[in-house]
Amino acid sequence: MVLPLFAVLTLNAGAGELGALRAVGQAPILLLSLLAGAWVDRWRTRTLMVLTDAGRALALGAAAVAGLLGWLGLPALLVVAFVVGALSVVFDVAYQASLVRLVQRDQLVRGNSALEGSRSAAQIGGPALGGALVSVLSAPIAAASSAAFFALSFLSIRRIGRRETIPEPERSERPARVWRRIHEGLRFVVGDTSLWTVCLASAAFQFFFAAVMTVYLLFLPRDLQLSGTAVGLALAATGPGALLGSLLAARLPSRFGYGTVLVSAAALGDGVFLFVPALHGSSAVTVLALLMVNFVFGTFSQLVNVTVMAVRQTVTPDGMQGRVAATINFVGMGMTPFGSLLGGVLAEAWGTRTSLLVAAAGMLLSPALMALSPLARLGRTLPAPPDTPVPSA
């Protein structure tokens, strides 16, 4: 949030430059996700999350110092975006694998709901604060505040006292090489219809959502003439929406069925962005409409996130959690750099309104893929845990 807004509002970055900045920050997903999955299955997730939080705090702290010294131009932003992106890849894979090591499988939905709810709470104030700091004070101050929040996360995770169980390879087998473990994760995901559908649906969503967000961050300040504070406030509405989605995820799937919830929530959450290109002006009505759009998107996208995570964790053996999460991130989130670049290209060629409409329509491919897959037929209970032994790692 801070780096893209700084590029647009302070450096007057164009659509192509903003697309490139977002793509550089997302490129580590393609470069590191699969390796991160292999590491996570052999390390304590708490250790990895602590180290990566410390690294992100240091990187953004360095950006703050560079900004105060007048060195924070686009090249420096690209470096910081890449470093923070690389560390975030490892953190996210470890985060997704951590819960299975800490709770029983029948508590996964409730546990994911609680975890994602706490993460959503951070989204309520984060974007608004970041936008306000960039707009009212300066980008270095905003970067320093982000560094402080990562440091706070570092301290919080260090306080986790419960000991996690690390999956061990069979003693009779030599530990496999990293690339062999990566191949095992890929093969497991491709061989499971539900997981492979999650991959494809995630790829479709992330590709078009990245394009939407690149155009969105140009459309709000330039076409609608919104300040950085107003942009941050609009994006912050995703937070309370996601908090509501986390609470609903603990109840709705068991009442209406996991498949019904996945498909309908994805269609509603993704489809709401189709209303944004119709907005004009910077009136209070426009800001209110943006708040509603982001709230609805946050609610239903989080409902999908928590439900998908519970399904994935249930059908995956304990010793494969990191690699399966990383494979899905690689296929899904790996599309974001290309989507960001596409958003920049479309905005320059067609303008922001048309580009936003096309990219938002593309997001509906994700629920369509889920509707045509076995995921749509999931009932009110999670699938049975796998009995297949995990390949030695």
Per-region residue spans from a language model:
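Alpha-helical transmembrane-bundle signature of multi-pass membrane transport and export proteins
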Residues: 1-393
